């Protein structure tokens, strides 16, 4: 899987003028076991949201940054609003689910920047994603793909099991990839996919865990590009310890 998109596309003025990046920061972070929303968790003097926005801005491919924050953020986590302001990001309150937060961000974009054609949806929990991953996803959108996700090879052997925990199969790792963010979409495709998700039976809809799955369910093809190991998701206390160990200061690769 090799990308040969013209590097000029990453800084083309018309590309920037029609692209937005949404950073999802409204998650509660329950599994992280911190006494604050995940986006507000500290990594060496800065919040996860700050680090995510730093990498996002360094990519240089978006006219507009949008941040979703938890309800009552002004009282519960004012630093998130300060971080968003530092990066001139549009702030909107997120919902109770990831999908609700994405839709809230798309609505805010439609009101503020109706000319946006492409949007990258990024998890704040993947705070140290290199800027080049954003550029690669954005570049793939410009050459005709309507949905693009960064992926990395699966390292572990994966087993499928039944309800009793008995192994039922071993999928080939050659055919499997771990999905990261940012996930990029033509904005009309993403909106249509989420509208379609509302028509699905609850048992089916609840299986959709990210935007790419919604687009798949809608029937649109999803293209993959190369992700990066630094784009790991900070979900558990162990993940947070790893992040603090790997990035004792501002990440040197923030601008790469």
Segments (PLM) and residue ranges:
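Short phosphate-binding loop-to-helix
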Residues: 82-118
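SAM-dependent methyltransferases
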Residues: 1-22, 26, 202, 210-212, ...
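Acidic metal-phosphate-binding loop of nucleotide-sugar-dependent transferases
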Residues: 30, 98, 124-128
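Acidic helix N-cap motif at the loop->helix transition within catalytic regions
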Residues: 75-80
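Conserved core of the sugar-phosphate nucleotidyltransferase
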Residues: 129-225, 256
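Conserved active-site beta-strand element of glycosyltransferases/polysaccharide synthases
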Residues: 222-226, 232-235
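Residue-level signal for inorganic ion chemistry
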Residues: 23, 49, 105, 122-123, ...
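N-terminal glycine-rich phosphate-binding loop and ensuing alpha1 helix
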Residues: 2-74
């Amino acid at each position: 899987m090799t990308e040969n998109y013209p590097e000029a596309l990453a800084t083309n003025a018309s590309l920037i003028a029609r692209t937005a990046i949404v950073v999802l920061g409204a998650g509660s972070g329950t599994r992280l076991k911190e006494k604050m929303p995940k986006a507000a968790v500290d990594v060496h003097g800065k919040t996860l949201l700050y680090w995510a926005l730093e990498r996002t801005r360094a990519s240089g491919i978006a006219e507009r940054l949008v941040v979703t924050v938890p309800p009552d953020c002004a009282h519960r986590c004012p630093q998130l609003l300060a971080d968003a302001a530092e990066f001139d990001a549009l702030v909107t309150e997120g919902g109770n689910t990831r999908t609700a937060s994405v839709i809230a961000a798309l609505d805010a974009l439609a009101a503020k920047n109706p000319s946006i054609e492409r949007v990258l949806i990024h998890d704040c929990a993947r705070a140290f994603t290199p800027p080049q991953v954003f550029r690669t996803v954005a570049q793939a959108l410009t050459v005709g793909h309507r949905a693009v996700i960064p992926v990395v090879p699966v390292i572990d052997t994966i087993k499928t099991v039944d309800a009793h925990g008995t192994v039922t199969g071993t999928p080939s790792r050659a055919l499997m990839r771990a999905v990261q963010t940012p996930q990029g979409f033509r904005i009309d495709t993403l909106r249509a996919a989420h509208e379609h998700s509302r028509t699905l039976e609850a048992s089916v809809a609840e299986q959709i865990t990210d935007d790419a799955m919604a687009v798949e369910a809608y029937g649109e093809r999803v293209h993959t590009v190369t992700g990066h190991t630094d784009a790991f998701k900070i979900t558990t206390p162990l993940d947070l310890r790893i992040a603090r160990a790997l990035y004792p200061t501002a990440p040197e690769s923030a601008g790469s």
